[in-house]
Amino acid sequence: MATPAFFDYETYMTNKLAQVQNADPAAGWTMTKLMDSFAQNGFVGADGAYAHFVQFGAAEEIAPNADFNANEYYAAKAAQFYGVEPKAVTEFQIANVKQIITSNGMNAWTHYQQFGSAEGVNPSNAFDADAYLAAKAVAMGDGWTAEKVAEAIKGNGMTVLEHYLQYAGTGENEVAKGATYPVPDDQKVPSSVTSTTYDLTVGQDSLSGTIGNDTFNAFIFDNQNTLQSGDRIDGGAGHDVLNADLGTSALFAATPEIKNVEVIKFRAQANAADNGS
């Protein structure tokens, strides 16, 4: 599988490492361990990492380069969708837009490729599409405008970011090598999201996560399960984790309702004698 210009192997692996370290801090993830895990599953080198991105990474919101950020893209799309200033977009608006996108079978990267770039939505605070299009029009000269450049890029089946990463510095009609186009400070969207840890109780719990990477802990308390029938957990957006210990404190199987939680870890324990049946 050929590796496209938008895919930066080192950046992707660094971002993936951060994701697994956040999801499982006790696992002792290192870059060497991650690369070994990739290789054991058939994802070797840059081509293998790109294959992993296509199969898993995009859906996990792991950025393939330094100029894309899933959280910032969702925020930029929300600002455009609701018609508000980028700095004024709220977490509720961001979460709602992300829900719309994911419920239609897309993620930040695939939505940007299919729709966002053509709509003029920035892929992150690190890349101002309008600034790049204006600079590219100047480099082209001879009556070119930013609008004409945008149409030409779209007509060639590319996003603005892909065009920049593939062609910057490659010819006299291109922008200079190493030129960057960060979003102005007063037009940046919020770059961080709230992540929360929730502890379940021995009562009935109904918990909804944030758009961040939330953790739900359901540990045994006073010899009782805290994850039990009647509990409802909705992780919401982000890469969420449920840690649950289950003991034999009830006569019936626990049947909680769980959705939008990406990682679920169960530990089961029992202290009952075998009755021979």
Which sequence ranges carry the predicted segments?
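Solvent-exposed, low-complexity segments and loops of surface/extracellular structural proteins
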Residues: 1, 141, 146, 180-277
